[in-house]
Regions:
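Mid-to-C-terminal alpha-helical segments outside catalytic/metal-binding sites
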Residues: 62-83, 101-105, 114, 130, ...
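Active-site gating/metal-coordination segments in enzymes
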Residues: 182-304
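Catalytic pocket-lining loop regions of alpha/beta-barrel enzymes
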Residues: 248, 255-404, 412, 429-440, ...
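N-terminal secretory signal peptides
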Residues: 1-63
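Active-site gating loops and adjacent loop-to-helix segments of metal-dependent hydrolytic enzymes
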Residues: 38, 126-158, 290-295, 364-368, ...
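Divalent metal-dependent hydrolysis catalytic cores, especially in the metallo-beta-lactamase
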Residues: 118, 133-156, 165-188, 211-217, ...
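C-terminal segment of N-terminal export signals and the immediately downstream linker at the start
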Residues: 3, 55-63, 83-120
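Acidic (Asp/Glu)-rich catalytic clusters
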Residues: 164-172, 193-210, 229-238, 272-277, ...
């Protein structure tokens, strides 16, 4: 997979090189989907403030700096540092960072919150993405991570076993949906459709209950794609289908089959098959296509925004169109500050606002916005923008049409993102100027809906029944935590050292 050029990759370093073991990223971490921005002055200030807090509070709590930063109190300290830099966006107090008992009690209170992560990934066993192996070898040689020194490295951190640890043991996630991505090169699919449903079966069997859902990927225009839908429906029995209108997001230079959601001749036959099979949820990758990428691949630009969503939603009211990344355009090649400034001047966030306006403009109720990657990117780089994006989606789509996704494991264990949304509130000045309503408490109706109730409804999952029947995975997590299990605070990808 070669999404970044050799020249771009040469100036980046592995995210695991980051010496600062922060509970939340203090710089943007990118997969090869986009070129990450350099650490901003504000992010450097957050890092410095958190470092000082750790140096002060860890000795008082009788723990190492590393242990502190992996604790609930350390997580609170990270959001405290962010508030000091960006303003009061996150609900946290210095007392929570200073008192591990208080922090742990809050964590226990929220631990049973139902969280359905509708946007997760891991890589197949025979993946060719060797860049991540080289990254981990370099980490070991540099001595940054003692666990990697003098040990041959593999991609296990991006594969099944570590996925289970980071998603189900190191976070409050209760249910997840495993996704994939297609390619013109068959071996460069993240997971094939049979691999994806095999992972679902493996986790559910180990758990003794329903913990995992699975996509099947559909690829309009590729040879045999309709036959593959038929095969997947009959043999794999996926919970939903996912498509990439960009065609091949992995090898954009090879993408020969981009498509539009509202293409009657090419794509509507797939919707007919989905509807006939009772598969109502159509997940679509949109956005993450900044101007820098557009300059490289201008021919793909007509396929990556959300201009094709409304017509398809209107033509297919029996289906739900879940737009991944909520169409957010600027993951790199345009700064979050620029996006925030544009919003403050125009009231718009490119492509997110377009998505949020679809229900009012077109009278549809079957369009959903997914927070995967978009929340992670903006929360760590410009949390006011994260608040704006969530606020716009809630205002336009309705809080019952916004769904949680983390894009783990690329972003590491998703607990920092979960805590970010739990604590996030839209600042008073944005509420007054733009009419946003408060998001409310961590376990209030808006956030409970986003975190899990909406996806549970979409996928027919009974939350009450789940809560009443602890399974083997619940017991495994309890044993893991009792034995002192902790988050790694690792992320997998590239950072810009500038």
């Amino acid at each position: 997979m070669r999404l970044l050029s050799d020249e771009e990759r040469a100036v980046l370093v592995p995210a695991e090189f980051d010496r600062f073991d922060s509970p939340i990223p203090t710089r943007i971490v990118a997969s090869e989907e986009f070129f990450p921005l350099a650490q901003t002055p504000a992010q450097r200030e957050v890092e410095a403030r958190l470092s000082r807090l750790a140096d002060t509070l860890a000795p008082r709590q009788g723990v190492s700096r590393r242990r502190f930063l992996r604790s609930a109190a350390g997580m609170a300290a990270a959001f405290l540092a962010m508030n000091e830099v960006y303003g009061p966006l996150f609900g946290v107090s210095r007392a929570e960072a200073a008192d591990p008992g208080l922090a742990d009690e809050r964590a226990r209170t929220l631990a049973d919150q139902f969280i359905f992560d509708g946007h997760t990934h891991f890589l197949r066993e025979d993946t060719r993405i060797e860049t991540f192996v080289r990254m981990r070898e370099a980490v070991g040689k540099a001595g940054w991570n003692p666990a990697l020194i003098d040990k041959p490295q593999t991609l296990e951190d991006l594969k099944f076993e570590n996925y289970v640890k980071e998603v189900f043991l190191d976070s409050d996630t209760k249910v997840a949906l495993i996704s994939s991505a297609p390619s013109e090169v068959p071996q460069d699919w993240f997971l094939t459709n049979p691999m994806t449903v095999a992972a679902r079966a493996r986790i559910n069997e180990q758990a003794g209950g329903r913990r995992m859902f699975a996509h099947a990927i559909f690829t309009p225009g590729q040879p045999g794609w309709l036959d593959e839908i038929d095969r997947a429906i009959e043999q794999d029995q996926p919970d939903s289908f996912k498509g990439y209108t960009i065609g091949d997001n992995t090898h954009k230079d090879l993408s020969r089959h981009p498509w539009r959601i509202d293409d009657e001749k090419r794509v509507y036959p797939a919707y007919e098959k989905f509807a006939a099979a009772g598969l109502k949820n159509v997940c679509i990758h949109k956005g993450l296509f900044p101007p820098s990428v557009e300059r490289q691949f201008p021919h793909l630009r007509p396929y990556v925004d959300v201009s094709d969503v409304a017509r398809a939603a209107k033509d297919w009211p029996q289906l739900n169109f879940i737009i991944y990344h909520s169409g957010y355009r600027f993951p790199g090649g345009g700064t979050p500050e620029e996006a925030l400034a544009a919003f403050e001047a125009t009231g718009r966030v490119e492509w997110v606002t377009d998505l949020a306006e679809i229900p009012q403009k077109h009278g549809v109720t079957n369009v959903y916005g997914d927070l995967g990657q978009v929340f992670a990117l903006t929360a760590v780089s410009q949390p006011r923008l994260a608040a704006v994006i969530v606020g716009q989606l809630v205002a336009g789509l309705g809080h019952e049409h916004v769904v949680w996704g983390s894009d783990a494991v690329w972003t590491g264990a998703p607990q920092w993102q979960i805590e970010g949304l739990r604590r996030l509130e839209i600042p008073d000045d944005l509420q007054a100027s733009f009419g946003f309503k408060p998001l409310g408490p961590a376990d209030g109706p808006v956030k409970n809906a986003i975190f899990g109730e909406n996806s549970a409804r979409l996928y027919g999952f009974e939350i009450t029944r789940f809560a009443q029947r602890p399974d083997r995975l619940s017991a495994l997590k309890a044993d893991y935590l009792a034995a002192g299990g902790e988050r790694s605070n690792l992320r997998y990808g590239y950072v810009n050292p500038g």
